[in-house]
C-alpha cells in the first residue's frame, strides 16, 4: 500500500537558503539573478553537491563562492559550461590553451549598433534557439548573458579571462570547445535542449541514458562560426573588464543589469541604454574605491560587503534609468 510522503512548507525571504542547507545528495540552484547567492553558499557550507544553473551567484560572489567549494563540489548546468566540463576531460589543465565559448548571436545577430537603437522589448524576447524566461532572454539579446558566462567559465575552470574566446555560432549545436596546446580542439555537440546538461548536473560525471535526443547526423547540420561584433554588443568585453578588475566589479555589472532589464521591458529606456548604463555604473563604482558603493578588492570581499555593493548598484542604475527616461 502506497502512502503519501511527509512534506512541509518553507516560506519567507530565506526559505530557499534554509532548503538548500538541508541534507540531500544534490541541490540544483536554478534561481534567476543575485537572489541565488545565499542558497549557493548554504549548499556549499552543507557539503552538498551544487548543480549550478544560477551563474549570477558565482559571478557576484567570486572568491567567496570558489573558496567555499570543495574540489568537484560545483557542477555546471549551463549548456556551455557543461560542455567545457566534458571537453576538459580530454586533457590536463596545463595542456589547455583556451576555452571557446559559443554564442547564438541572439535575435539581432548581424545588426550594427545604429540598427539596434530602436529594438523593442517584444523583439528582444524572440530568441532564435532557446525558450527561456524574460530576464535571461533579454540578457541573451544584449549578450549580457554571454558576459556572465565568460565570468563563470573563468571562475569555474581557473582559466584567465584573456584565454576565453567568444565566437558566434547561430546553429547552437556546438555548445562550447576547448583548444589544447597541441592544436587539437575538442567540442561538445548536441541539440539545443537543456535536458542533457541538467541530467549531467544531477549525476555528474555519470551519464543518464536517453536524457535527450541526439543530433540527426544524416541531415545537414549548421557548423558555421563568425566573430563577435563587440561594437554592437559591448556587454561581453565590459564583463571581461569587470572580471579583470575583480572583487565586487562583476556584482555591480550583474546588479545594474537586472534593474535596467526591468526598465527596458517597461519602456523607460532603450535597448542600447542597458549596456551603456551598466558601463556608467561600473565606472562610477571603480572610481569610488574606499567610499560607500566603491570597489572592493578580492581580499575585501564579504557577504555583507557584496550585498551592500549590490544595493548601491541597483539604486544608481535606477537613478540613471530615470534620468534617461
Give, region by region, the residue ranges found by the protein language model.
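Catalytic, metal-anchored helix/loop core of enzyme active sites in primary metabolism
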Residues: 1-325
Amino acid at each position: 500500500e502506497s502512502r503519501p510522503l511527509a512534506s512541509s512548507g518553507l516560506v519567507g525571504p530565506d526559505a530557499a537558503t534554509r532548503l538548500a542547507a538541508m541534507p540531500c545528495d544534490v541541490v540544483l540552484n536554478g534561481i534567476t539573478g543575485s537572489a541565488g547567492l545565499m542558497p549557493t553558499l548554504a549548499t556549499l557550507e552543507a557539503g552538498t553537491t551544487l548543480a549550478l544553473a544560477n551563474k549570477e551567484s558565482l559571478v557576484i560572489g567570486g572568491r567567496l563562492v570558489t573558496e567555499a567549494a570543495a574540489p568537484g563540489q560545483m557542477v555546471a548546468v549551463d549548456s556551455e559550461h557543461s560542455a567545457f566540463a566534458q571537453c576538459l576531460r580530454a586533457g590536463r589543465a596545463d595542456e589547455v590553451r583556451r576555452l571557446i565559448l559559443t554564442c547564438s548571436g541572439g535575435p539581432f545577430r548581424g545588426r550594427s549598433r545604429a540598427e539596434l537603437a530602436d529594438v523593442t522589448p517584444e523583439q528582444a524576447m524572440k530568441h532564435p534557439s532557446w525558450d527561456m524566461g524574460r530576464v535571461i532572454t533579454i540578457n541573451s539579446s544584449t549578450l549580457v548573458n554571454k558576459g556572465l558566462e565568460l565570468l563563470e567559465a573563468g571562475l569555474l575552470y581557473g582559466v584567465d579571462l584573456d584565454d576565453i574566446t567568444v565566437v558566434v555560432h547561430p546553429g547552437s549545436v556546438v555548445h562550447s570547445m576547448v583548444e589544447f596546446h597541441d592544436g587539437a580542439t575538442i567540442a561538445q555537440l548536441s541539440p539545443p535542449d537543456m535536458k542533457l546538461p541538467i541530467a549531467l548536473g544531477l549525476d555528474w560525471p555519470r551519464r543518464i541514458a536517453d536524457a535527450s535526443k541526439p543530433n540527426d547526423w544524416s541531415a545537414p547540420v549548421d557548423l558555421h562560426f563568425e566573430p563577435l561584433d563587440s561594437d554592437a554588443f559591448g556587454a561581453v568585453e565590459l564583463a571581461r573588464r569587470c572580471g579583470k578588475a575583480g572583487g565586487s566589479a562583476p556584482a555591480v555589472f550583474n546588479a545594474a543589469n537586472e534593474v535596467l532589464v526591468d526598465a527596458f521591458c517597461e519602456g523607460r529606456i532603450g535597448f542600447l541604454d542597458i549596456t551603456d548604463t551598466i558601463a556608467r555604473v561600473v565606472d562610477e563604482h571603480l572610481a569610488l574605491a574606499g567610499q560607500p558603493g566603491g570597489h572592493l578588492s578580492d581580499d575585501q570581499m564579504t557577504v555583507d560587503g557584496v550585498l551592500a555593493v549590490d544595493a548601491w548598484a541597483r539604486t544608481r542604475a535606477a537613478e540613471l534609468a530615470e534620468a534617461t527616461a
